[in-house]
Regions:
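Positively charged n-region of N-terminal signal peptides that target proteins for export
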Residues: 1-4, 19
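Sec-dependent N-terminal signal peptides
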Residues: 4-13
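Secreted/periplasmic proteins
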Residues: 18-131
Length: 131
């Protein structure tokens, strides 16, 4: 009986603490930390095969399918911008609580270039949404 209880405890514990794969789940709303791309990534290839350009309003996220449009709102100042997800983040960034890595243009609009990180809300929006 003790062995059965121990085995049951191990199974339940391992499933409760197992890491969930969130790659491309397309959540409607998500909260977390945003960062922005380093300048040395300019013109590098993204997960969609296109080149990353700091002047475009794009982002990398493991929580949305590629080519999903999301409104990103900086919770510290209320500014928002709509970006298209065209890349994936390194898993180590997601492990640090980051939900999106934005282009430099998007980070400028949101007003967190100096701090480098900010708390954000992400909301999935229809393709082509401007605001």
């Amino acid at each position: 009986m003790k062995r059965i209880l121990l085995l049951l405890f191990i199974v339940i514990s391992s499933s409760a603490f197992g890491q969930k794969d969130t790659l491309g789940q397309d959540l409607d709303t998500l909260y977390g930390i945003a960062s922005y791309y380093s300048p040395h990534f300019d013109s590098s290839k993204t997960a969609t095969g296109e080149m990353y350009l700091h002047s475009k309003l794009t982002g990398a996220s493991n929580f949305y399918k590629l080519n999903t449009w999301v409104r990103v709102t900086n919770l510290r100042n209320g500014r928002s911008v709509v970006v298209r997800i065209n890349d994936r983040m390194a898993r180590r960034m997601a492990a640090k609580g980051r939900v999106i890595d934005l282009s430099r243009s998007a980070a400028k609009i949101l007003g967190f270039m100096k701090s480098g990180l900010t708390k954000v809300q992400l909301v999935r929006v229809p393709k082509g949404t401007k605001k």
